[in-house]
Structure formats: C-alpha cells, structure tokens
Amino acid sequence: MNSLLMITACLFLIGTVWAKEGYLVNKSTGCKYECFWLGKNEFCDKECKAKNQGGSYGYCYSFACWCEGLPESTSTYPLPNKSCGRK
C-alpha cells in the first residue's frame, strides 16, 4: 500500500515539474502575444490562466507572454506551418 502511494505521488510530481511552457501564440496569426512591461505582467498572467489556455502562471519575457504549467493541448510559439506575419 505504501509503495502504491509513493508511486502515485512521484507520478504527480513528474507531471507537475514537466508541465509544458512556452510563448503564448495567437492561432489565427501565428504571432506571440506581445507585452512591454517585462517581468511580472498582469496581462500575460491573465491570458495564460484563461480557460482556453489553462496555464498556471504567465509573465513578460523578451517582449512576449511566456506561460508555465500549460496543458499539452495548448499551442505555443512557433506553430507548425504558420509563420508570424507571413501568409
């Protein structure tokens, strides 16, 4: 019983530590969400935590919103076969 509990706890921690992270991307344009206030950023945090994104934390890094704790289903920059600003 203790072994099962330990295995479950380890799997949970692995999922938490290895959660997806990356730049939040606009699916229609292929561009990153821009921001100008580097570091802690209310806009980025709000966008990353939105229901359709599912992230746990967001901040402004290199003038774009970086998200942590994203589910695997959330798209991040770059999108395959879609370049920002190009058709």
UniProtKB/Swiss-Prot annotation:
The modification Cysteine amide is found at C84. Its main location: secreted. Residues 20-85 form the LCN-type CS-alpha/beta domain. InterPro entries: LCN-type_CS_alpha_beta_dom (IPR044062), Scorpion_toxin-like (IPR003614), Scorpion_toxin-like_sf (IPR036574), Scorpion_toxinL (IPR018218), Scorpion_toxinL/defensin (IPR002061). Keywords: Amidation, Disulfide bond, Ion channel impairing toxin, Neurotoxin, Secreted, Signal, Toxin, Voltage-gated sodium channel impairing toxin. GO terms for molecular function: sodium channel inhibitor activity; toxin activity. Residues 1-19 form the signal peptide. Expressed by the venom gland. Residues 85-87 form a propeptide. GO terms for biological process: defense response. Has the structural arrangement of an alpha-helix connected to antiparallel beta-sheets by disulfide bonds (CS-alpha/beta). Beta toxins bind voltage-independently at site-4 of sodium channels (Nav) and shift the voltage of activation toward more negative potentials thereby affecting sodium channel activation and promoting spontaneous and repetitive firing. This is Neurotoxin Cex4. It comes from Centruroides exilicauda (Bark scorpion).
